[in-house]
Amino acid sequence: MTKLHYKVKDISLAAWGRKEIEIAENEMPGLMTLRKKYGPAQILKGARIAGCLHMTIQTAVLIETLTALGAQVQWSSCNIFSTQDQAAAAIAATGVPVYAWKGETEEEYNWCVEQTIVFQDGQPLNMILDDGGDLTNLVHEKYPQFLAGIKGISEETTTGVHNLYKMFKEGKLKVPAINVNDSVTKSKFDNLYGCRESLIDGIKRATDVMIAGKVAVVAGYGDVGKGCAQSLSKMGARVLVTEIDPINALQACMDGYQIVTMETAAPLSNIFVTTTGCRDIVRGEHFAVMKEDAIVCNIGHFDCEIDVAWLNANAKKDTVKPQVDRYTLANGVHIILLAEGRLVNLGCGTGHPSFVMSNSFCNQTLAQIALWTKTEEYPLGVHFLPKILDEEVARLHLDQLGAKLTTLTEKQSEYLSVPVAGPYKVDHYRY
């Protein structure tokens, strides 16, 4: 059977998608600078990158950066609801194979990911760009014959990074990987500032609820949880936080939030947001005591944080509109579930703004370049990008914000034992 060149919702959406991509490019100065810097040398020539990452307008700019640098690229989304169909169409129309549409079934999702492994000429992938680990796991488990030819994996998100470390610890990881998530210009920007804007956008588009005056509980106080708590608080909600880690819990307390258990929060809260990357955070016993029309949503990568199966088994489901379901419990109370417990900011909104994603995707691009061109520096294991590149990503975004850096004098440089051009911090500095 001949391989499809692409599969998207509607290729006629390409013109709309192209207009949005052009606007996004102006908001993604880092990626556009990397095109100018590395494009002429075609630094990724020969790379066959299989990508599994939310097929959004911002990702379209990333894809076109990779191809501008000489790579061949095939793409699927890493979530069944996160594709922006106009973005998928616009990229497919350029000849890049895209297999993604909003509202895939689980079976369709798996099919889409699998389409990215072998290219149109019959050659397999030799690089992986992943978000969450589904593509990495698929290749390791189902296509081990291709592993020897893969130079590297770059992983976008916390959940996928956990997967890489677990695989490496168990001896199952067969390809060198770069942990993009823990680059400072990713985790401290995308995870925090991105979620701070996109969480509210998703909730508002889905429900139009007034957040001011409500009680909201945020499960988890990592970078994602911090951003979510800030946004809810700034909208006027009283924010509760649940945590397992005493350090994060103390941070939340010092930021003015009350640390409670989910058992305490469940009957008090109007809005529930899970951010943990763990399973079984909101369970049946919590649903049973919730307020009328409590809004429950997740902004962690996978859909295991909220026990949706319990709701489906114990409550009557009524779909209000796509990605908004209102459940009726046996006690007559209604619960509103967003995006079927998957990423609310992408399922009900359009995800993070372009500017902050330029930070993340610069890290992805630099990781792909590093793994492709400096293979000998990345033995089997999970690595980080060097600090000097992290600083460079930040530097690429300052002009657009009108920021002017101070330059160290030679005496200051000598006094601090810090190079004038950086890096300015030791690797373990926490920011």
Curated annotation (Swiss-Prot):
<dbReference type="GO" id="GO:0045335">
    <property type="term" value="C:phagocytic vesicle"/>
</dbReference>
<keyword id="KW-0378">Hydrolase</keyword>
<dbReference type="GO" id="GO:0007163">
    <property type="term" value="P:establishment or maintenance of cell polarity"/>
</dbReference>
<dbReference type="GO" id="GO:0031012">
    <property type="term" value="C:extracellular matrix"/>
</dbReference>
<feature type="binding site">
    <location>
        <position position="186"/>
    </location>
    <ligand>
        <name>substrate</name>
    </ligand>
</feature>
<dbReference type="GO" id="GO:0031002">
    <property type="term" value="C:actin rod"/>
</dbReference>
<comment type="function">
    <text>Adenosylhomocysteine is a competitive inhibitor of S-adenosyl-L-methionine-dependent methyl transferase reactions; therefore adenosylhomocysteinase may play a key role in the control of methylations via regulation of the intracellular concentration of adenosylhomocysteine.</text>
</comment>
<feature type="binding site">
    <location>
        <begin position="299"/>
        <end position="301"/>
    </location>
    <ligand>
        <name>NAD(+)</name>
    </ligand>
</feature>
<protein>
    <recommendedName>
        <fullName>Adenosylhomocysteinase</fullName>
        <ecNumber>3.13.2.1</ecNumber>
    </recommendedName>
</protein>
<dbReference type="GO" id="GO:0004013">
    <property type="term" value="F:adenosylhomocysteinase activity"/>
</dbReference>
<feature type="binding site">
    <location>
        <position position="131"/>
    </location>
    <ligand>
        <name>substrate</name>
    </ligand>
</feature>
<feature type="binding site">
    <location>
        <begin position="222"/>
        <end position="227"/>
    </location>
    <ligand>
        <name>NAD(+)</name>
    </ligand>
</feature>
<dbReference type="GO" id="GO:0030552">
    <property type="term" value="F:cAMP binding"/>
</dbReference>
<feature type="binding site">
    <location>
        <position position="156"/>
    </location>
    <ligand>
        <name>substrate</name>
    </ligand>
</feature>
<dbReference type="InterPro" id="IPR000043">
    <property type="entry name" value="Adenosylhomocysteinase-like"/>
</dbReference>
<dbReference type="GO" id="GO:0005938">
    <property type="term" value="C:cell cortex"/>
</dbReference>
<feature type="binding site">
    <location>
        <position position="191"/>
    </location>
    <ligand>
        <name>NAD(+)</name>
    </ligand>
</feature>
<keyword id="KW-0520">NAD</keyword>
<dbReference type="GO" id="GO:0005829">
    <property type="term" value="C:cytosol"/>
</dbReference>
<dbReference type="Pfam" id="PF00670">
    <property type="entry name" value="AdoHcyase_NAD"/>
</dbReference>
<feature type="binding site">
    <location>
        <position position="345"/>
    </location>
    <ligand>
        <name>NAD(+)</name>
    </ligand>
</feature>
<dbReference type="Pfam" id="PF05221">
    <property type="entry name" value="AdoHcyase"/>
</dbReference>
<feature type="binding site">
    <location>
        <position position="243"/>
    </location>
    <ligand>
        <name>NAD(+)</name>
    </ligand>
</feature>
<dbReference type="GO" id="GO:0006730">
    <property type="term" value="P:one-carbon metabolic process"/>
</dbReference>
<dbReference type="InterPro" id="IPR036291">
    <property type="entry name" value="NAD(P)-bd_dom_sf"/>
</dbReference>
<dbReference type="InterPro" id="IPR015878">
    <property type="entry name" value="Ado_hCys_hydrolase_NAD-bd"/>
</dbReference>
<keyword id="KW-0554">One-carbon metabolism</keyword>
<dbReference type="InterPro" id="IPR042172">
    <property type="entry name" value="Adenosylhomocyst_ase-like_sf"/>
</dbReference>
<dbReference type="GO" id="GO:0005634">
    <property type="term" value="C:nucleus"/>
</dbReference>
<dbReference type="GO" id="GO:0005737">
    <property type="term" value="C:cytoplasm"/>
</dbReference>
<comment type="pathway">
    <text>Amino-acid biosynthesis; L-homocysteine biosynthesis; L-homocysteine from S-adenosyl-L-homocysteine: step 1/1.</text>
</comment>
<comment type="subunit">
    <text>Homotetramer.</text>
</comment>
<comment type="similarity">
    <text>Belongs to the adenosylhomocysteinase family.</text>
</comment>
<feature type="binding site">
    <location>
        <position position="190"/>
    </location>
    <ligand>
        <name>substrate</name>
    </ligand>
</feature>
<dbReference type="GO" id="GO:0033353">
    <property type="term" value="P:S-adenosylmethionine cycle"/>
</dbReference>
<dbReference type="InterPro" id="IPR020082">
    <property type="entry name" value="S-Ado-L-homoCys_hydrolase_CS"/>
</dbReference>
<feature type="binding site">
    <location>
        <position position="56"/>
    </location>
    <ligand>
        <name>substrate</name>
    </ligand>
</feature>
<feature type="binding site">
    <location>
        <begin position="157"/>
        <end position="159"/>
    </location>
    <ligand>
        <name>NAD(+)</name>
    </ligand>
</feature>
